[in-house]
């Protein structure tokens, strides 16, 4: 007679299938199977959430257990962040470098025009420097010629003045006129020149020229100053005596 277990189920025969090693009976639920089914359901939910996040935002969600993108079978260093970004497109630095290269690259016509422009400017600078040197040399030469002409003109003027002086002192009354013309000399004054001229006239006087010599010493230019004395009558008397001297 088969023995009954404490739960009322008949115990198996020796060597037969065991009923208590995790295999559920016909009417009972296995706890281990239920736990495994629950874990599989949670894992499937997590995978579905990641798939929806990729479709919505375009970026993969965090990997479970710290696994890198691409799964545990991905090679180390191949699926890192930077390389993974380059697999989808160029990085920001690469895009900036390529943009600078495109900006720096210019058409052949523009490059040729720039070279011709530089050559033309260099030629203009060289021509300007050459003209400046020529102008300086020409200016120095003209200045030297001007100084030579001035010196020549000065020598001619001195020679003409000597000739004029010799001709002047050969004429009559040259000494008297010379005294009068030299009144601005610091050694002579107007009174001294007039006195010397009067003495010379007395020494060489001739009868009937006294009033003429007196009139020569007078200033007959009218004065317009109010403070000057009225000598118009005296002036008229001297002029009349000069023109018609008294007969002794």
Swiss-Prot record:
This is Clathrin light chain A. It comes from the Eukaryota. It is a peripheral membrane protein. It comes from Homo sapiens (Human). The modification N6-acetyllysine is found at residues 223, 242. Residues 100-162 are annotated as: Involved in binding clathrin heavy chain. Belongs to the clathrin light chain family. GO terms for cellular component: clathrin coat; clathrin coat of coated pit; clathrin coat of trans-Golgi network vesicle; clathrin complex; clathrin vesicle coat; clathrin-coated endocytic vesicle; cytoplasmic vesicle; cytosol. It is found in: Cytoplasmic vesicle membrane; Membrane, Coated pit; Cytoplasm, Cytoskeleton, Spindle. The keyword Cell cycle applies. Residues 1-92 are annotated as: Disordered. Residues 13-25 have a biased composition (Gly residues). PROSITE patterns: CLATHRIN_LIGHT_CHN_1 (PS00224), CLATHRIN_LIGHT_CHN_2 (PS00581). GO terms for molecular function: clathrin heavy chain binding; GTPase binding; peptide binding; protein-containing complex binding; structural molecule activity. Its main location: membrane. Clathrin is the major protein of the polyhedral coat of coated pits and vesicles. Acts as a component of the TACC3/ch-TOG/clathrin complex proposed to contribute to stabilization of kinetochore fibers of the mitotic spindle by acting as inter-microtubule bridge. The modification Phosphoserine is found at residues 105, 206, 236.
């Amino acid at each position: 007679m088969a023995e009954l277990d404490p739960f009322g189920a008949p115990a198996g025969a020796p060597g037969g299938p065991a009923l208590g090693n995790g295999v559920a009976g016909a009417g009972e639920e296995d706890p281990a199977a239920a736990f495994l089914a629950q874990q599989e359901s949670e894992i499937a939910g997590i995978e579905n959430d990641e798939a929806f996040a990729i479709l919505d935002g375009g970026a993969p969600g965090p990997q479970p257990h710290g696994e890198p993108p691409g799964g545990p079978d991905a090679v180390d260093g191949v699926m890192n962040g930077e390389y993974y970004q380059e697999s989808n497109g160029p990085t920001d630095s690469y895009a900036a470098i390529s943009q600078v290269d495109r900006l720096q690259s210019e058409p052949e016509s523009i490059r040729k025009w720039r070279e011709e422009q530089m050559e033309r400017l260099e030629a203009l600078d060289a021509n300007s420097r050459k003209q400046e040197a020529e102008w300086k040399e020409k200016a120095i030469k003209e200045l030297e010629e001007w100084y030579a002409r001035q010196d020549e003109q000065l020598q001619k003027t001195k020679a003409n003045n000597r000739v004029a002086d010799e001709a002047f002192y050969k004429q009559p009354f040259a000494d008297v006129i010379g005294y009068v013309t030299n009144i601005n000399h610091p050694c002579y004054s107007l009174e001294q020149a007039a006195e010397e001229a009067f003495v010379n006239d007395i020494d060489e006087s001739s009868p009937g020229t006294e009033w003429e010599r007196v009139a020569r010493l007078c200033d007959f230019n009218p004065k317009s100053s109010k403070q000057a004395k009225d000598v118009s009558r005296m002036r008229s008397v001297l002029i009349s005596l000069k023109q018609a001297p008294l007969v002794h």
